[in-house]
From Swiss-Prot:
Its main location: membrane. It comes from Salmonella typhimurium (strain LT2 / SGSC1412 / ATCC 700720). The chain crosses the membrane at residues 37-57, 105-125, 144-164, 165-185, 208-228, 230-250, 266-286. GO terms for cellular component: plasma membrane. Keywords: Cell inner membrane, Cell membrane, Membrane, Transmembrane, Transmembrane helix, Transport. Residues 101-290 form the ABC transmembrane type-1 domain. PROSITE patterns: ABC_TM1. This is Glutathione transport system permease protein GsiD. NCBIfam families: PRK15082.1. CDD domains: TM_PBP2. It is found in: Cell inner membrane. The complex is composed of two ATP-binding proteins (GsiA), two transmembrane proteins (GsiC and GsiD) and a solute-binding protein (GsiB). Part of the ABC transporter complex GsiABCD involved in glutathione import. Probably responsible for the translocation of the substrate across the membrane.
Length: 303
C-alpha cells in the first residue's frame, strides 16, 4: 500500500502543473489571434469610442445640436469656441457631428440587425430543407439582388415616405438576401456533418438541429459579416439623407448635414468636411474590424 501511494505521489509530482491562464479555450484562442491584428485593434478601439460617444452624445456636446444658434459666427471656421466651426445657421458643427454619431450609428446597427435576424432564419430554412423552400427563398433573394442596394432603398423609402425609421426599414430589406445566402451556404455544409446525423438518430427535432447545432456553427461568419455590413448600412442611410429621403432638418444626421452644406461648399468647406470625415472613418473602422475578426475567428482564411 505504501509503495502504491509512493508511486502515485511520484506520478502527481511529475505531471506538469497547468495554470488557469494556460488553459486554451475558444475565447482565449480568439483573443490571442485577434490581438495580433494591430490595425483591427485600433479599429476596434475607434468603434468602441464611437459607441460611447453615441451613447453619451447629448451630455458631451458643448452646445445644443438643434436649438443653439450663434448668429455672430455664421459659417466661421474652427476656433477655440467652436472646434469644428459653425454652419450657415450658426449651429455648432462639433455638437452636431457628435449627436449625428448617435443617429447614424443607430440607423446602421438597427438596419443590419433586422436584416441579420430575418436573413439568418430564411437561410437556415433554405439550406436545411432545400427543395421548394430553397428555390422559393433564393428566387426572392435573386430578385432583390437584381437591383443595386441604394436603388432598392430609394424605392422602399419612396413608398413608405421619408424619415429615419423608414430608412432603417429600407436598408434592412436589402441586407436580408445577403445574410440569407451566407447562412444558406454554411447550412448546406454543416447539415452533412456526422454530428447532425447523430442528432437525427437520437430523435432531435428539426428546430433543435437548426438552432442548437447548425446555427452555432454559422455564428462566426454572421458576426464578421454583420460588422462589415454596418459600414455599408451607414453609407446607405447617409446617402438617402443626403438625397432628402432620410433624416430631415434640423436632425443632425451626417448625410443630412452634407445635404445642408452643399450651398456653402465653396465659401465654408468645413461645414461638409467634418461630417464627411466622420462617415469615412466610421465605415473604414467597421471594415477593418470585420477583417480582423474574420482572421481571428477563422485563421485558415487568411492568406
Amino acid at each position: 500500500m505504501r509503495l502504491f501511494n509512493w508511486r502515485r505521489q511520484a506520478i502527481l509530482h511529475a505531471m506538469p502543473v497547468v495554470k488557469p491562464d494556460q488553459i486554451r479555450t475558444p475565447w482565449r484562442e480568439f483573443w490571442r489571434r485577434f490581438r495580433r491584428q494591430h490595425v483591427a485593434l485600433v479599429a476596434g478601439g475607434f468603434v468602441l469610442a464611437l459607441i460611447l460617444v453615441a451613447i453619451f452624445a447629448r451630455w458631451l456636446t458643448p452646445y445644443d445640436a438643434e436649438n443653439y444658434f450663434d448668429y455672430d459666427s455664421l459659417n466661421n471656421g474652427p476656433s477655440l469656441q467652436h472646434w469644428f466651426g459653425v454652419d450657415s445657421l450658426g449651429r455648432d458643427i462639433f455638437s452636431r457631428v457628435l449627436v449625428g454619431a448617435q443617429i447614424s450609428l443607430a440607423a446602421g446597427v438597427f438596419a443590419v440587425f433586422i436584416g441579420a435576424i430575418i436573413g439568418t432564419v430564411l437561410g437556415l430554412l433554405a439550406g436545411y430543407y432545400e427543395g421548394w423552400w430553397d428555390r422559393f427563398i433564393m428566387r426572392i433573394c435573386d430578385v432583390l439582388f437584381a437591383f443595386p442596394g441604394i436603388l432598392l432603398a430609394i424605392a422602399v423609402v419612396a413608398v413608405l415616405g421619408s424619415g429615419i425609421a423608414n430608412v432603417i426599414v429600407a436598408v434592412a430589406i436589402f441586407s436580408i438576401p445577403a445574410f440569407a445566402r451566407l447562412v444558406r451556404g454554411n447550412t448546406l455544409v454543416l447539415k452533412q456533418q456526422t454530428f447532425i446525423e447523430s442528432a437525427r438518430s437520437i430523435g432531435a427535432s428539426d428546430t433543435t438541429i437548426l438552432f442548437s447545432h447548425i446555427l452555432p456553427g454559422t455564428v462566426s461568419s454572421i458576426v464578421v459579416f454583420f460588422t462589415m455590413r454596418i459600414g455599408t448600412s451607414i453609407i446607405s442611410a447617409a446617402s438617402l439623407s443626403f438625397l432628402g429621403l432620410g433624416a430631415q432638418p434640423p436632425t443632425p444626421e451626417w448625410g443630412a448635414m452634407l445635404n445642408e452644406a452643399r450651398a456653402d461648399m465653396v465659401i465654408a468647406p468645413h461645414v461638409a468636411l467634418f461630417p464627411a470625415v466622420a462617415i469615412f472613418l466610421t465605415v473604414l473602422a467597421f471594415n477593418l474590424l470585420g477583417d480582423g475578426l474574420r482572421d481571428a475567428l477563422d485563421p485558415k482564411i487568411k492568406g
